[in-house]
A protein has these predicted regions:
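Selected transmembrane alpha-helices and immediately adjacent juxtamembrane segments
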Residues: 1-50, 126-205, 274, 278, ...
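Hydrophobic faces of alpha-helical transmembrane segments in multi-pass integral membrane proteins
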Residues: 22, 26, 30, 66, ...
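Hydrophobic alpha-helical transmembrane segments
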Residues: 32-42, 61-77, 120-129, 158-165, ...
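Helix-coil boundary and interhelical linker segments in multi-pass alpha-helical membrane proteins
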Residues: 36, 80-87, 140-141, 267
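Alpha-helical membrane segments and immediately flanking helix-loop junctions
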Residues: 57-114, 208-262
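Short loop segments and helix-boundary regions at transmembrane helix junctions
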Residues: 113-121
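Extracellular/periplasmic helix-loop-helix junctions in multi-pass membrane proteins
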Residues: 262-274
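Membrane-interface capping segments at transmembrane-helix boundaries
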Residues: 288-301
C-alpha cells in the first residue's frame, strides 16, 4: 500500500504543481500589472456593488471572478498582492470555499443528475448565506484581530520600482515564491489524500455505505472524487441519497486543501471549516428528512 500511496502522490503532485504554476504566475502578474498601471480601480468599480455586499475592497472583484469560474489558486494569485486583513481573507475564503471552479464542478454534478441551474443558484445563495454572520455581526465577534494583516509581505507596492523592467522582474520572482509556497502546502495535503484514497474502505466500497463513502471522499479530497464515487455507486442509491450527498458536497468539500490555502494568509481556520460543515449538515438533514422520493423512483438508475 505504501508504494501505491507514493506513486499516486507523485502523479498527483506533479500534475497539481503544473496547474498551480500555470494558474498562479499569470494571474499574479496580471493583478500586479493592473495595479502598476493604475487600471485596477476602473475594473474593480464595475464589481463594486458585489464586493460591497461582502464587505470586501473593490479590488478583490478579480479574485472572486477567478475563483468562481476557475479555481482557488487563481483567486489567491489575484488576492495575494492586495494586502488584505484577516477579516477580509476569512470572508473571501468562506465565500469561495462554497462557490468556486463552477465551470468544471457544475458539469460533473450534471452527470449525476443535478441540473445546472440548481447547482449554480444553490451555491450562489449558500455562499452568501455562509458569510452573512461575518457581515451582519461585528468583526470581532468571530475574529480576535480582524484588522491585522497576517502577511505584510504582500502589501501593495506600486511606487517602489525604478522602471518597468524592475517591476516585472520583482513581480515575476514574487509570483514564483508564492507558487512554490502553495505547491509545498498542497503537496503535503496531497500526500495525506493519496493515503486516504488508498484506504481499503474507499477502494472496495460496500454498496450499503456508498452514501457515507461519497460524502467522506468529497469532504476530505474534493467534489470531483466524491462525485466519482457517486457515479460508480449511483445504481445502488436512492435519489434522496444522491441529492443529499451532492448538496452536502456543494456546501463543504476539499475541507483541508481549500481551507489551508486561505489560512496561510491569515483566514480563521475554525470559521472556514465549521461554518461550511454546519451548513452542510443542516442541508443534508433537511433533504433526508423532508425530501419525498417518488414511488416509481425508489432507486436511482
Amino acid at each position: 500500500m505504501t508504494s501505491q500511496v507514493f506513486r499516486d502522490f507523485k502523479k498527483s503532485s506533479i500534475s497539481t504543481s503544473k496547474i498551480i504554476l500555470i494558474m498562479v504566475i499569470p494571474y499574479y502578474l496580471l493583478a500586479e500589472l493592473l495595479i502598476y498601471f493604475e487600471l485596477m480601480p476602473y475594473i474593480a468599480g464595475i464589481f463594486s456593488p458585489f464586493t460591497e455586499l461582502l464587505n470586501l475592497p473593490p479590488e478583490t472583484s478579480l479574485a472572486i471572478a477567478a475563483g468562481v469560474f476557475f479555481n482557488l489558486y487563481a483567486a489567491v494569485a489575484f488576492a495575494a498582492p492586495l494586502g488584505m486583513n484577516i477579516y477580509e481573507w476569512t470572508i473571501l475564503g468562506l465565500f469561495l470555499g462554497v462557490l468556486h471552479n463552477m465551470l468544471v464542478e457544475v458539469s460533473i454534478l450534471k452527470k449525476i443528475g443535478i441540473p445546472v441551474v440548481t447547482s449554480v443558484s444553490y451555491r450562489f445563495l449558500m455562499a452568501f448565506f455562509a458569510v452573512s454572520p461575518l457581515i451582519l455581526l461585528p468583526k470581532n465577534f468571530f475574529l480576535s484581530n480582524p484588522d491585522s494583516i497576517f502577511k505584510p509581505l504582500y502589501e501593495i507596492k506600486v511606487k517602489n520600482y525604478e522602471n518597468f523592467m524592475s517591476f516585472f522582474t520583482n513581480t515575476f520572482f514574487d509570483s514564483l515564491i508564492l507558487s512554490v509556497q502553495i505547491i509545498i502546502l498542497v503537496s503535503l495535503v496531497l500526500l495525506m489524500t493519496s493515503f486516504i484514497k488508498n484506504l481499503s474502505f474507499l477502494k472496495k466500497i460496500n454498496h450499503q455505505v456508498a452514501l457515507t463513502s461519497s460524502i467522506l471522499s468529497g469532504l476530505l479530497i474534493g467534489i470531483v472524487y466524491g462525485a466519482g464515487v457517486l457515479l460508480s455507486e449511483a445504481k445502488y442509491m436512492t435519489k434522496k441519497q444522491i441529492y443529499s450527498s451532492c448538496f452536502f458536497l456543494m456546501t463543504a468539500h476539499a475541507i483541508i486543501e481549500d481551507t489551508l490555502l486561505f489560512v496561510y494568509f491569515g483566514a480563521n481556520v475554525w470559521v472556514l471549516t465549521l461554518f461550511r460543515l454546519f451548513l452542510a449538515i443542516i442541508v443534508f438533514y433537511l433533504i433526508m428528512t423532508f425530501y419525498q422520493t417518488p414511488v416509481i423512483d425508489k432507486q436511482y438508475h
